[in-house]
Amino acid sequence: MGALNQTRVTEFIFLGLTDNWVLEILFFVPFTVTYMLTLLGNFLIVVTIVFTPRLHNPMYFFLSNLSFIDICHSSVTVPKMLEGLLLERKTISFDNCIAQLFFLHLFACSEIFLLTIMAYDRYVAICIPLHYSNVMNMKVCVQLVFALWLGGTIHSLVQTFLTIRLPYCGPNIIDSYFCDVPPVIKLACTDTYLTGILIVSNSGTISLVCFLALVTSYTVILFSLRKQSAEGRRKALSTCSAHFMVVALFFGPCIFLYTRPDSSFSIDKVVSVFYTVVTPLLNPLIYTLRNEEVKTAMKHLRQRRICS
């Protein structure tokens, strides 16, 4: 409580992506277009799955949740980044900074757990197909989604508590375009070595353990595909390769950012742009371009809309 009472900083100032005004204007248009396409693409996937009965199965149930999380995840940081590209003084209040930090880790951690669950779903479907309907029924799927949100919330609460328990009495300049734990705790008026270790341990353990679980699942799947027919192998590889591309695009930046006690914020900003702006857009593109069922369902919905 004493640490909280010492807090005197009321707002933070972002340095942003660059200090070059011309580059900021040039960045604004493509980032705005990317964000709008992210919202549209992921929203279309959710709507398509909800209104297509034959897609009401575990794989697409999880995919719709992934699209929802991507919408939320990008919306936590991108609007503030776009605002900062147009303003000379990029500020955020202390309370809003902590809120942004909380929701950033909530959605990021929930996505990590969801991608791990999706890998397990594919493992059951391909390796033990006769038990799939019993193991992955809708009741279990709903329970898994509840568990991943609970896990994401607990992780985010831990990260947020470790951040706000520190005293902030200046400076208040964040070398980033959004509030995240590493750049924020650097501004604390006390030694943050132990806090940094705890934060890296929390995020790093989750990222690495889930990534190892994913790699293990796909390794077992690849070995089991030798027993499948040519058509079965083709369909399974198409689904799994799309999912693994999403995993690599998301886990790579997360492991890079959150498993190092010391960060280079100039490099971190580039990596952060990739996983907060680019990856949420690539997810719907990867799944729709490589998934005939989703593409066909979207065409049917469009035809129904035209006919009505």
UniProtKB/Swiss-Prot annotation:
Descriptive protein name: Olfactory receptor 4E2
Per UniProt, what does mutating C179 to A/V do?
Answer: No receptor activity in response to MTMT binding, even in the presence of copper
The annotated consequence of M298A reads: Decreased receptor activity in response to MTMT binding, even in the presence of copper. Complete loss of receptor activity in the absence of copper
Residue positions annotated to bind Cu cation are H105, C109, R260
Its function, per the record, reads:
Olfactory receptor that is activated by the binding of organosulfur odorants with thioether groups such as (methylthio)methanethiol (MTMT) and bis(methylthiomethyl) disulfide. Also binds odorants cis-cyclooctene and tert-butyl mercaptan. The activity of this receptor is mediated by G proteins which activate adenylyl cyclase (Potential).
What does the UniProt entry list as the effect of changing H105 to A/L/R? No receptor activity in response to MTMT binding, even in the presence of copper
Chief location category: membrane
Impact after mutating C127V: Decreased receptor activity in response to MTMT binding, even in the presence of copper
Cited InterPro entries? GPCR_Rhodpsn, GPCR_Rhodpsn_7TM, Olfact_rcpt, Olfactory_Receptors
List the source organism. Answer: Mus musculus (Mouse)
According to Swiss-Prot or TrEMBL, what is its membrane topology? Multi-pass membrane protein
Q: Which residues are glycosylated?
A: N5
Recite the lineage of the species: Eukaryota, Metazoa, Chordata, Craniata, Vertebrata
Q: Which residues lie on this side of the membrane: Extracellular?
A: 1-24, 79-97, 165-204, 258-268
Q: What is the effect of changing H155 to A/K/N/V?
A: No receptor activity in response to MTMT binding, even in the presence of copper
Xref: CDD domains: 7tmA_OR4E-like
